[in-house]
From Swiss-Prot:
Keywords: Endonuclease, Hydrolase, Metal-binding, Nuclease, tRNA processing, Zinc. Homodimer. The lineage of its organism: Bacteria, Bacillati, Bacillota, Bacilli, Lactobacillales. This is Ribonuclease Z. Zn(2+) 1 binds at residues 63, 65, 145, 216. Belongs to the RNase Z family. Binds 2 Zn(2+) ions. Its EC number is 3.1.26.11. InterPro entries: Metallo-B-lactamas, RibonucZ/Hydroxyglut_hydro, RNase_Z/BN. It comes from Streptococcus thermophilus (strain ATCC BAA-250 / LMG 18311).
Length: 309
């Protein structure tokens, strides 16, 4: 499981950073890639990676500002051009208006998609659980931005314990159907009368990962709720230390406020993105150092960077 950041800048592209987009790679878990936001130029960024567009099965949009959605119609169209590869349907989650925006762009440009796009629009009345399958659940909560904006909490369900095959062999269990029964939690009796207690040969379930990805926001308790105990918290850092007033007026956060959220949420790691173009080189180092005075495990991500979870 990895995060890869396709765009880490704020507002508009710069020479160092493209606008907002990242992917959560779940290839080992479910053979899928999930995208979060799709700003202008996202598909160009993908060309610099190993990401295959057909593997992108779900797209989660945080809000309707252009730097988070202007790349979406183009990405969907390019995904359709992969005619030599199997086409699979795609799900788009986002605020009310995302369906109209995408479909209007598709229709007016004469684009034809070779797959179906299923939309799940989110409003004040549909916050909470927005997606669930047998491996993952995704929750959304409203943040505090200048327009309706959400953050997402991706929860991997606990993984089943593993079967200790060597211990079973040592106990005299023949390889075959009995292994499957024991793996399913069934106690078995061998031909010689030996009773095998399944739980003695299965490790404890492994706790699933929690990944929190926030959209643009002022400092808010919703960010803490979404980030509670997260293995990774992705939080915007449009502004730096001392910029709290201007950050609030523009609906954004500083690095220090993001660090406070991570601390209050007891997150394990804080990844800062959505960085203003005015922060370069030495400024980035200071921004990270300042945030670490509040939350030590802080890192400012750069475009195309991969982070293992």
């Amino acid at each position: 499981m990895e995060l890869q950041f396709l765009g880490t800048g704020a507002g508009q592209p710069s020479k160092a950073r493209n606008v907002s987009s990242l992917v959560l790679k779940l290839l080992d878990e479910i053979n899928e890639v999930w995208m979060f936001d799709c700003g202008e130029g996202t598909q160009r960024q993908i060309l610099e990676t190993t990401i295959k567009p057909r593997k992108v099965k779900k797209i989660f949009i945080t809000h309707m500002h252009g730097d988070h959605i202007f790349g979406l119609p183009g990405f969907l169209a390019s995904r359709s051009f992969q005619s030599s590869e199997e086409q699979t349907d795609l799900e788009v989650y986002g605020p009310v208006g995302i369906k109209q925006y995408v479909m209007t762009s598709i229709r007016t440009s004469g684009t034809r998609l070779s797959y179906h796009v299923h939309f799940k629009e989110i409003d004040e009345n549909s916050l909470g659980l927005v997606m669930e399958d047998d491996k993952f659940a995704v929750y959304a909560d409203k943040l505090d931005h200048t327009i309706f904006c959400v953050g997402y909490r991706v929860v991997q369900k606990d993984l089943e314990g593993t079967l200790d095959a060597e211990a079973l062999k040592a106990a005299g269990v023949p390889f075959g159907p009995l292994f499957g029964q024991i793996k399913n939690g069934q106690d078995v009796v061998l031909e010689d009368g030996t009773k095998i207690i399944a739980k003695d040969f299965i490790s404890a379930p492994k706790k699933g990962k929690v990944i929190t990805i926030l959209g643009d926001t002022r400092k808010t308790n919703a960010s803490v709720r979404l980030g509670l105990g997260a293995d990774v918290l992705v939080h915007e850092s449009t502004y730096g230390k001392g910029d709290e007033k201007i950050a609030k007026s523009h609906g954004h956060s500083t690095n220090m406020q993001a660090a406070q959220v991570a601390r209050d949420a007891s997150a394990k790691r804080l990844l800062l993105n959505h960085v203003s173009a005015r922060f370069l080189g030495r400024d980035i180092g200071k921004m990270a150092a300042d945030a670490k005075t509040i939350f030590e495990n802080t890192h400012i991500v750069r475009d195309l960077e991969e982070v293992e979870i």
